[in-house]
Amino acid sequence: MTQSTHDGHAAHSLHGGVYPGNLFMVVAPSGAGKSTLVNALLSKDSDICLSISYTTRKPRPGEQDGQHYHFTTVEDFRTRHAAHEFLESAEVHGNYYGTSRVWIEEQMKNGHDVLLEIDWQGALQVKKQFRNAVGIFILPPSLDALEERLKKRGQDEPKVITRRLLAAGSEIAHAPEAEYVVINENFERALAELECIVAATRLRFASQYARHTELFIELGIHLPHAE
């Protein structure tokens, strides 16, 4: 998320390929409502799919392997990392997370939009390889609201909540690196804003060109060279 991209190009890979699918990265401090918003977006938009990350953390109540995460061991994670299987990887709160490179590229080549629930460190890694990946940062309406949400969630011990709140400040400091910021004070409004971001991204010139190449060529419209 290091650079804003307003040149209208579609998703470019490290090797210069232009894919018809778009890559979205949703970043937020713990408790900001990221997962709830993402799940609501996915339920309303069948043209976007969620990348399922690998993680070494233990499943939370209700989480299923292969649906929410690919839960794995530290040893297996390190083996995959050494084999360069991950588009990005990071250690967050003592646990490892990684995103499958091959799966994402296959989806985008086939015209599917991909959404990553990711931390700011991982977003930086993705941006180096897909320079037009769209970063969306979800902010809480206040730090007090963030603390209240973490407590109501009932998933963490008090000491863990304290640690997450301390980390939130440094995480929020990376919001300027995103292309878009959504303040999750009113859920329906925040969801509508997410939908607008996705819709606008799909209308960028090169996204349209990649999806409707024959029409554009027939009309004499050509894809400009990236700078």
From Swiss-Prot:
Gene Ontology CC, one term: cytosol
Keyword Cell membrane annotated: no
Signal peptide region: none
Pfam families, per database record: Guanylate_kin (PF00625)
Keyword Chloroplast appears in the UniProt entry: no
Gene Ontology MF term list: ATP binding; guanylate kinase activity
InterPro entries on file: GK/Ca_channel_bsu, Guanylate_kin-like_dom, Guanylate_kinase, Guanylate_kinase_CS, P-loop_NTPase
EC primary class: transferase
Keywords from the UniProt entry: ATP-binding, Cytoplasm, Kinase, Nucleotide-binding, Transferase
Positions of ATP binding: 28-35
UniProt-annotated location(s): Cytoplasm
Cross-referenced Gene3D superfamilies: Guanylate Kinase phosphate binding domain, P-loop containing nucleotide triphosphate hydrolases
Disulphide-bonded residues: none
Domain Guanylate kinase-like: 21-199
Reactions this protein catalyses: GMP + ATP = GDP + ADP
PROSITE patterns in UniProt: GUANYLATE_KINASE_1, GUANYLATE_KINASE_2
Family: Belongs to the guanylate kinase family.
Function: Essential for recycling GMP and indirectly, cGMP.
Protein name in UniProt: Guanylate kinase
Species for this entry: Burkholderia lata (strain ATCC 17760 / DSM 23089 / LMG 22485 / NCIMB 9086 / R18194 / 383)
Phylogenetic classification of the source organism: Bacteria, Pseudomonadati, Pseudomonadota, Betaproteobacteria, Burkholderiales
